[in-house]
Amino acid sequence: MKKIVVLCSLLLLAAVLPMQAQRFAYVDTEYILSKIPEYQTAQDQLNRLSEGWQKEIEALMNEAEQLYRKYETEKVMLSEAMQAQREEEIMRKEESAKQLQQKYFGREGEMLRKQQELIKPIQDKVYQAVKDLSAADGYTIVFDTAGGANVLYANPKNDKSDAVLKKLGYSN
C-alpha cells in the first residue's frame, strides 16, 4: 500500500512539475510598431506610393469613362467599323487600368514588394527581440494581442510590449 501511495505521489509530481515550468507572456505588436519611428516613416512612404499609384489607375479609368461617354453620344453617327474601333479602344483602356492595378496591388505587385522591403526588416527586429526576451526570461509562449486576437483576458503584468521596445532601444 505504501508503495502505491509513493508511486502515485511521484506520478502526480511528475505531471505537475512541467505545468509549473511553463511561463506565458503577451505583446501588442501594433503598439510596439507604433512606437518605432522607422516603422512610421515606412508606413508614410507606402501610403504615398499607394496614393500615387491609385491616382494613376483612376486617371486611366477616367479616360476610359470619358471615351465611353463620348462614344455613347456619337454612336448614332458612327459606322459599324468605327463603333467597333471605339469599343475596342475603350476596352483596351479599361484593360490597361486593370493590368496597372494588378501590377501595383496584385498578389505579387509592387506594393507587396515595397512592404517586404520596408516593413519586414522592422518586423523581423521586433520578432527577434521577442525571441530574445522569451529566452532570457524563460517564457515558453508569447501571445500577440494586436488586431483583436482571441485573448479574453490577460493580466497587464504579463504584457511585455514595453520590455520589447526597451530591448529594441526605444522608450515608451
Model-assigned labels for residue ranges:
Residues V16-A21:
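Sec/Tat signal peptide C-region and signal peptidase I cleavage site
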Residues Q22-D137, I141-A149, S171-N172:
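Amphipathic alpha-helical segments
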Residues L152-A154:
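Short, exposed beta-strand-loop hairpins at the edges of beta-sheets
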Residues I4-A15:
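Sec-dependent N-terminal signal peptides
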